[in-house]
Amino acid sequence: MNHDQSHALFSRAQQLLPGGVNSPVRAFKSVGGEPFFVERADGAYLYDVDGNRYIDYVGSWGPMIVGHNHPAVRQAVKKAIDNGLSFGAPCAGEVTMAETITRLVPSCEMVRMVNSGTEATLSAIRLARGATGRNRIVKFEGCYHGHGDSFLVKAGSGMLTLGVPTSPGVPAGLSELTLTLPYNDFEAATALFEQQGDDIAGLIIEPVVGNANCIPPREGYLQHLRALCTKHGALLIFDEVMTGFRVALGGAQAHYGITPDLTTFGKIIGGGMPVGAYGGRRELMQQIAPAGPIYQAGTLSGNPVAMAAGLAMLELVQQPGFHADLAERTARLCAGLEAAAADAGVAVTTTRVGAMFGLFFTSEKVETYAQATACDIPAFNRFFHAMLEQGVFLAPSAYEAGFLSSAHDDAVIEATLAAARVAFRAAKG
């Protein structure tokens, strides 16, 4: 593949943008090499500035569940733009969006729109602290909830790639209010709540970890956390920025049958546009300003164009059989990847929940953060580049989940597996 134009753009970007990018994982630091620059996207494909086409399993990090540039979403955006870009005042779309979310996710009796997943999680923990009168927050090793100071403590995703336990600039006093548990460890969670349960305002978790690759919860684990939070008066917060409306229509909470107190959502509710939301029980959400004393605001919250895009996408995912079909395709992809790896003599295991999957270069079943970090990362990096050169784009980090969309049809999956058969041989080194 020719990458001359991408190389030229990256050289320019490095003079003006820190690391040449606006989000660290895009820089390919983990896998080596340089990123390609996208010119357009359509369906299951990205097209770069050099004219190369890639099957996309990143999906803008999850939200493009109906594929890129879907005609219905595109038409909704065009119609909304004709009426204006931003009002700074209420619009009908945000009411319809709230009605849609509360109908599809019953634990969310009320919702507040924001502008990103990070903003949603920051607002949710502020609400948890304000509602309980407590200060401590519990999170999990390998889970990532955005770049808020309270979360950059043994964080996953980009922070895990950089190999540092926290970020400079986070006050020690604030980080001390964040308690970190090993994911999928029943005993550790019980012990922590027995010791400090009276000080814990809330526990925030990715119900399926998507930022240390894809790690599903052990059977009964989420139920265990729900019981601990209820017993000790802490709020259970599900970060469904990745899993919401993807692993099931009602998100991971519907898939696993758990009712959290608060839920955060990200750009999937904006059809991929910059947007987020948080919601929960009415008595909690009524404490948010102006109804209550806990302050949170946003000039662009409920943006009319983002609401139109999100509503169009959420209409599509409600079609009968949508999620079952995606789950079946994901299962077929994962089985094919494991078979191709076995044929090449490469130790690989996969995980999946709905249309979200993980690929680990290990023979072990991965259920913990420690197991994820112990995988053969150099082998993944070789595999990544071998796939990329054949026109298949995986997340440029061994610590990120993969995502399918309804545009990933049988032909796309077969093309992916054909590339994988070649790439696994390259991964052996």
Swiss-Prot record:
Principal place of residence: cytoplasm
InterPro entries found in the cross-reference section: 4pyrrol_synth_GluAld_NH2Trfase, Aminotrans_3, Aminotrans_3_PPA_site, PyrdxlP-dep_Trfase, PyrdxlP-dep_Trfase_major, PyrdxlP-dep_Trfase_small
UniProt key word Cytoplasm: yes
Keyword ATP-binding: no
GO biological process: protoporphyrinogen IX biosynthetic process
Gene Ontology cellular component list: cytoplasm
The protein's required cofactors: pyridoxal 5'-phosphate
Enzyme Commission number(s) from the entry: 5.4.3.8
Keywords for this protein: Cytoplasm, Isomerase, Porphyrin biosynthesis, Pyridoxal phosphate
Pathway(s) this gene product operates in, as recorded in its UniProt entry: Porphyrin-containing compound metabolism; protoporphyrin-IX biosynthesis; 5-aminolevulinate from L-glutamyl-tRNA(Glu): step 2/2
Chain positions with N6-(pyridoxal phosphate)lysine modification: 267
Subcellular location: Cytoplasm
A Pfam family per the record: Aminotran_3
PROSITE patterns from the UniProt entry: AA_TRANSFER_CLASS_3
One GO MF term: transaminase activity
Enzyme class: isomerase
Catalytically driven reaction(s): (S)-4-amino-5-oxopentanoate = 5-aminolevulinate
Database matches in PANTHER family: GLUTAMATE-1-SEMIALDEHYDE 2,1-AMINOMUTASE, GLUTAMATE-1-SEMIALDEHYDE 2,1-AMINOMUTASE 1, CHLOROPLASTIC-RELATED
Family stated for the protein in its record: Belongs to the class-III pyridoxal-phosphate-dependent aminotransferase family. HemL subfamily.
Subunit: Homodimer.
Name under which the protein is recorded: Glutamate-1-semialdehyde 2,1-aminomutase
Organism, as annotated: Stenotrophomonas maltophilia (strain K279a)
Organism taxonomic ancestry: Bacteria, Pseudomonadati, Pseudomonadota, Gammaproteobacteria, Lysobacterales
